From Swiss-Prot:
Reactions it catalyzes: 1-(5-phospho-beta-D-ribosyl)-ATP + diphosphate = 5-phospho-alpha-D-ribose 1-diphosphate + ATP
GO terms of biological process kind: L-histidine biosynthetic process
A Gene Ontology cellular-component term: cytoplasm
Keyword Transport: no
Main localization (coarse): cytoplasm
Protein name as it appears in the record: ATP phosphoribosyltransferase
Biochemical pathway: Amino-acid biosynthesis; L-histidine biosynthesis; L-histidine from 5-phospho-alpha-D-ribose 1-diphosphate: step 1/9
EC class (word): transferase
UniProt cross-references to Gene3D superfamilies, sorted A to Z: Periplasmic binding protein-like II
Keywords per UniProt: Amino-acid biosynthesis, ATP-binding, Cytoplasm, Glycosyltransferase, Histidine biosynthesis, Nucleotide-binding, Transferase
Protein species of origin: Pseudomonas savastanoi pv. phaseolicola (strain 1448A / Race 6) (Pseudomonas syringae pv. phaseolicola (strain 1448A / Race 6))
Length: 211
Protein backbone atom coordinates (compact mmCIF):
# COMPACT_ATOMS: atom_id res chain seq x y z
CA UNK A 1 0.00 0.00 0.00
CA UNK A 2 1.27 3.43 -0.98
CA UNK A 3 -0.06 6.25 1.20
CA UNK A 4 0.06 9.89 0.09
CA UNK A 5 -0.59 12.72 2.59
CA UNK A 6 -2.29 15.85 1.25
CA UNK A 7 -3.94 18.90 2.77
CA UNK A 8 -7.24 20.36 1.59
CA UNK A 9 -7.28 23.63 -0.28
CA UNK A 10 -5.09 25.01 -3.02
CA UNK A 11 -2.38 22.35 -2.69
CA UNK A 12 -4.89 19.51 -2.99
CA UNK A 13 -6.64 21.13 -5.95
CA UNK A 14 -3.34 21.62 -7.78
CA UNK A 15 -1.93 18.18 -6.88
CA UNK A 16 -4.86 16.03 -8.02
CA UNK A 17 -4.35 16.75 -11.76
CA UNK A 18 -0.68 15.78 -11.40
CA UNK A 19 -1.59 12.53 -9.65
CA UNK A 20 -4.14 11.85 -12.38
CA UNK A 21 -1.25 11.84 -14.86
CA UNK A 22 0.05 8.84 -12.92
CA UNK A 23 -3.37 7.17 -12.97
CA UNK A 24 -4.09 8.02 -9.33
CA UNK A 25 -7.59 9.46 -8.97
CA UNK A 26 -9.55 9.57 -5.69
CA UNK A 27 -12.76 7.53 -5.74
CA UNK A 28 -14.50 10.33 -3.81
CA UNK A 29 -14.18 14.10 -4.02
CA UNK A 30 -11.84 14.96 -1.11
CA UNK A 31 -13.31 18.47 -0.85
CA UNK A 32 -16.81 17.12 -0.26
CA UNK A 33 -16.08 13.86 1.56
CA UNK A 34 -15.74 13.78 5.33
CA UNK A 35 -13.45 10.78 5.09
CA UNK A 36 -9.81 11.37 6.00
CA UNK A 37 -8.59 8.20 4.26
CA UNK A 38 -9.68 8.14 0.63
CA UNK A 39 -9.16 5.19 -1.74
CA UNK A 40 -8.06 5.82 -5.30
CA UNK A 41 -8.56 4.14 -8.65
CA UNK A 42 -5.35 2.23 -7.92
CA UNK A 43 -6.25 -0.35 -5.27
CA UNK A 44 -2.86 -0.12 -3.58
CA UNK A 45 -2.77 3.69 -3.33
CA UNK A 46 -4.71 5.79 -0.82
CA UNK A 47 -4.80 9.45 0.16
CA UNK A 48 -4.60 10.81 3.71
CA UNK A 49 -6.24 14.20 4.25
CA UNK A 50 -4.35 16.05 7.01
CA UNK A 51 -3.51 19.58 8.11
CA UNK A 52 -0.90 21.26 5.93
CA UNK A 53 1.54 21.67 8.82
CA UNK A 54 1.21 17.97 9.70
CA UNK A 55 2.15 16.56 6.29
CA UNK A 56 5.92 16.37 7.04
CA UNK A 57 5.23 14.67 10.39
CA UNK A 58 3.05 11.96 8.82
CA UNK A 59 5.68 11.33 6.17
CA UNK A 60 8.73 11.37 8.45
CA UNK A 61 7.17 8.90 10.89
CA UNK A 62 6.02 6.54 8.16
CA UNK A 63 2.27 7.06 8.53
CA UNK A 64 2.45 8.19 4.89
CA UNK A 65 5.00 7.19 2.28
CA UNK A 66 4.77 10.46 0.38
CA UNK A 67 3.19 13.85 0.80
CA UNK A 68 2.88 17.29 -0.71
CA UNK A 69 3.83 20.28 1.44
CA UNK A 70 4.54 23.94 0.88
CA UNK A 71 8.17 25.00 1.12
CA UNK A 72 7.14 27.36 3.94
CA UNK A 73 5.96 24.38 6.00
CA UNK A 74 9.16 22.46 5.21
CA UNK A 75 11.36 25.43 6.16
CA UNK A 76 9.63 25.60 9.54
CA UNK A 77 9.76 21.83 10.10
CA UNK A 78 12.73 20.57 12.10
CA UNK A 79 12.56 16.83 11.34
CA UNK A 80 15.19 14.95 9.36
CA UNK A 81 13.45 11.87 7.94
CA UNK A 82 12.40 13.26 4.57
CA UNK A 83 13.58 13.36 1.00
CA UNK A 84 12.43 16.32 -1.09
CA UNK A 85 12.92 15.03 -4.64
CA UNK A 86 10.62 17.28 -6.65
CA UNK A 87 9.39 20.87 -6.82
CA UNK A 88 5.83 20.52 -8.11
CA UNK A 89 5.74 24.25 -8.97
CA UNK A 90 2.20 24.66 -7.62
CA UNK A 91 0.61 26.87 -4.94
CA UNK A 92 3.26 29.53 -5.52
CA UNK A 93 3.58 32.48 -3.15
CA UNK A 94 6.23 34.36 -1.16
CA UNK A 95 7.35 34.27 2.46
CA UNK A 96 7.96 37.88 3.44
CA UNK A 97 8.27 40.35 6.24
CA UNK A 98 5.62 43.06 6.37
CA UNK A 99 4.97 46.16 8.43
CA UNK A 100 2.75 49.21 8.65
CA UNK A 101 2.95 51.45 5.58
CA UNK A 102 5.45 54.25 6.20
CA UNK A 103 6.43 52.99 9.66
CA UNK A 104 10.02 53.63 10.79
CA UNK A 105 11.77 50.47 11.94
CA UNK A 106 13.01 50.72 15.54
CA UNK A 107 16.77 50.79 16.01
CA UNK A 108 16.64 48.59 19.08
CA UNK A 109 15.18 45.14 19.59
CA UNK A 110 12.61 44.25 16.94
CA UNK A 111 9.31 42.54 17.78
CA UNK A 112 8.16 40.11 15.09
CA UNK A 113 4.86 38.21 15.06
CA UNK A 114 4.64 35.00 13.03
CA UNK A 115 3.70 31.35 13.01
CA UNK A 116 7.05 30.65 11.32
CA UNK A 117 9.12 30.86 14.49
CA UNK A 118 12.06 28.74 13.32
CA UNK A 119 12.26 30.58 10.00
CA UNK A 120 12.20 33.93 11.81
CA UNK A 121 14.97 32.90 14.21
CA UNK A 122 17.23 31.80 11.35
CA UNK A 123 16.47 34.83 9.20
CA UNK A 124 17.27 37.42 11.85
CA UNK A 125 20.23 35.43 13.24
CA UNK A 126 21.80 35.60 9.77
CA UNK A 127 21.35 39.37 9.89
CA UNK A 128 22.77 39.57 13.41
CA UNK A 129 19.57 41.28 14.51
CA UNK A 130 18.18 41.07 18.05
CA UNK A 131 14.48 40.18 17.92
CA UNK A 132 11.62 39.11 20.14
CA UNK A 133 9.48 36.59 18.29
CA UNK A 134 5.79 36.41 19.15
CA UNK A 135 4.06 33.24 17.95
CA UNK A 136 0.60 33.71 16.46
CA UNK A 137 -1.54 31.21 14.58
CA UNK A 138 -3.61 33.61 12.49
CA UNK A 139 -4.72 37.19 11.82
CA UNK A 140 -1.06 38.25 11.64
CA UNK A 141 -2.03 41.60 10.16
CA UNK A 142 -3.45 42.73 13.50
CA UNK A 143 -0.12 42.60 15.32
CA UNK A 144 1.48 45.81 13.92
CA UNK A 145 -1.86 47.65 13.96
CA UNK A 146 -2.40 47.27 17.71
CA UNK A 147 1.25 47.57 18.76
CA UNK A 148 1.83 43.90 19.50
CA UNK A 149 4.71 43.71 17.01
CA UNK A 150 6.76 45.93 14.71
CA UNK A 151 6.66 43.44 11.85
CA UNK A 152 5.15 40.15 10.81
CA UNK A 153 6.47 37.25 8.77
CA UNK A 154 3.81 35.56 6.69
CA UNK A 155 2.98 34.01 3.35
CA UNK A 156 2.01 36.63 0.76
CA UNK A 157 0.10 35.86 -2.41
CA UNK A 158 -1.33 39.03 -3.96
CA UNK A 159 -0.61 41.32 -1.00
CA UNK A 160 -4.22 42.53 -1.03
CA UNK A 161 -4.90 41.45 2.56
CA UNK A 162 -1.82 43.33 3.76
CA UNK A 163 -2.78 46.51 1.93
CA UNK A 164 -6.39 46.29 3.13
CA UNK A 165 -5.03 46.40 6.67
CA UNK A 166 -2.56 49.24 6.15
CA UNK A 167 0.51 47.02 5.80
CA UNK A 168 3.06 46.58 3.04
CA UNK A 169 5.30 43.65 2.08
CA UNK A 170 8.96 44.37 2.80
CA UNK A 171 11.80 41.82 2.71
CA UNK A 172 11.55 38.62 0.68
CA UNK A 173 12.64 35.61 2.74
CA UNK A 174 11.84 32.85 0.25
CA UNK A 175 9.86 32.10 -2.89
CA UNK A 176 7.45 29.31 -2.00
CA UNK A 177 5.98 26.43 -3.98
CA UNK A 178 4.78 22.97 -3.01
CA UNK A 179 7.19 20.04 -2.91
CA UNK A 180 6.84 16.28 -3.05
CA UNK A 181 8.32 14.73 0.10
CA UNK A 182 9.13 11.06 0.61
CA UNK A 183 9.78 8.96 3.71
CA UNK A 184 13.39 7.73 3.64
CA UNK A 185 12.53 4.17 4.66
CA UNK A 186 9.70 3.97 2.12
CA UNK A 187 12.09 5.12 -0.61
CA UNK A 188 14.32 2.13 0.17
CA UNK A 189 11.54 -0.44 0.63
CA UNK A 190 9.40 0.64 -2.35
CA UNK A 191 12.07 2.28 -4.45
CA UNK A 192 10.92 1.19 -7.91
CA UNK A 193 7.29 2.13 -7.30
CA UNK A 194 8.04 5.51 -5.73
CA UNK A 195 10.73 6.41 -8.28
CA UNK A 196 8.31 5.63 -11.11
CA UNK A 197 5.74 7.96 -9.52
CA UNK A 198 8.36 10.70 -9.07
CA UNK A 199 9.38 10.37 -12.73
CA UNK A 200 5.77 10.56 -13.91
CA UNK A 201 5.07 13.61 -11.76
CA UNK A 202 8.26 15.29 -12.97
CA UNK A 203 7.17 14.82 -16.59
CA UNK A 204 3.72 16.21 -15.78
CA UNK A 205 5.24 19.26 -14.10
CA UNK A 206 7.62 19.86 -17.01
CA UNK A 207 4.81 19.48 -19.53
CA UNK A 208 2.59 21.92 -17.65
CA UNK A 209 5.48 24.37 -17.28
CA UNK A 210 6.20 24.29 -21.03
CA UNK A 211 2.58 25.00 -21.87
Amino acid sequence: MLTIALSKGRILDDTLPLLAEAGIVPTENPDKSRKLIIPTTQADVRLLIVRATDVPTYVEHGAADLGVAGKDVLMEYTGQGLYEPLDLQIAKCKLMTAGAIGAVEPKGRLRVATKFVNVAKRYYAEQGRQVDIIKLYGSMELAPLIGLADKIIDVVDTGNTLRANGLEPQELIATISSRLVVNKASMKMQHARIQALIDTLRKAVESRHRS
